[in-house]
Amino acid sequence: MVQDRLAVPRGRDRYGCAKTSIALAVSATLAGCATLDTSHDAASINTLLAAHGGPSTGWDRNSKDDASAVSSWLAHPLTSDVAVRVAMLRSPRLQQLYGELGLAHADVLQAVQVANPRLGISSLALQNGPGSQLVLGLAAPLVDLIALPSRTRLARLEQDRSRLRIASAVLTVSLDVESAWYRSIGAEQVAGMRAAVADALQTSADLAQRFFDAGNITELQLNRELAAASLARIAASRALIDARLARLDLNTLMGLRGSEAGWTSSAVLPLPVEHEDDPIVLRQTASASSLDLLAARKEATIFASSARTTRALRLLGGTTIGYDREREVDGSVIKGPTLDLDLPIFNQGGARVARADAQLRIAKAKLALIELSADNAIDLAVERVRVLSDIVRIHREELVPQREIVALRSQDEENYALIGEFEVLMAKAQEYDAYQGFLEAVRDYWLARVDLTRLVGSRLPSDREVTRNTPSVGDILHTGTAPPAAATHAGHATGADPTSTPTGAPEHHHNEGGQR
């Protein structure tokens, strides 16, 4: 702060005082108006999510209505849509994101705040003399005031980027829950099939023991059957643990514990879609609407604008403007504007400019890397989905029907005493293995589609084609249901068509509010 102790003519004094007062008043007004409305961030994020096929968020944490809704949802078999909706209300990761949204609000508001003006007061008295000198001074940072419009513009851009980033994180959580649901249902199906194989091989082992006790088979043949049954029990136990762990992971993502974690499921997965998406269309969709890509572009825009502002104001440094009023010992008053200027002799802001330019280069390189990686990753993910779809088809149309024929003809040959019961039981176990491979292939296919959805940043167009489900483990074990083409290959009917949605099974939809 500078105190001007030189008297000036009254006319110029009034003129200077008026200009300074107006400048400080305008500065205060600008600083007061430089606020951003963050009250609609939650609604804006939900709008972004809806545009990308994501779920709406429950921004009110654990209200009574939310608890009632969750209880109602969990009273029915859990679908992936319901799992995502529960997570939007209960997931600890979502609560963390809500907190990060509050931090983003604080950062944005902080960015547009001008440093408070400084008020200086001093009272100086003459030693052993009458009277005192009173000095009042008010100063404000000039750079903050000049840069305020630019900072406000940058803050709005940063606010938009924060919304995109939070929306992307929410979408990621929803896809994590969806993946966990597929893993849980798939693990439950595998556990059921491994248990069936273990039962079949245990039956074979028990039969072998009776034959050995009767002296009909050797000790070598007996232990072959016993060892196969032991391995099957081990595999069944591991599959059961895997299913429980997958269920635990899903409950953790949904934010469920205790009695709420005991939900039931229909334990069926959708069949692959008939026609997969065009990778060119998916790349175009990702380029236009991927939340991560949009956030990276917004970040590059922010650093470009920040670099321009830094370069324009590099010489001002810590310059302040103000107004002083001084009352002398004799009662006279002098007053006027002040300017506290940093002379850019040694430091001309080169470091700030270099830092801003480096940040801009990093942001541009990051954006280019995201764009390149997205294109390449989408191509690879599309190919992976296609290959897994082919694997599902091979299981449905070839392997499972072939194993069914082997099991059926083995039974026929056993009836004519051409082969023994051990061969029949082994053929049945191999048939169950084929079914397990089919169910695992379907699970892997949907996990690959979720990964592709992550890369695209929105729901895949072909999601609307999902209409049919796989057979459940119960259908396979009790009704003889097989994938299509089994009847035509085997030359006999094996049960209900598994490509139709079983009674009571959830249909597979990706629109908000639907079930899958």
Predicted regions and their residues:
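Periplasmic alpha-helical coiled-coil/stalk elements that build and connect Gram-negative outer-membrane
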Residues: A34, L148-S150, L157, L164-T285, ...
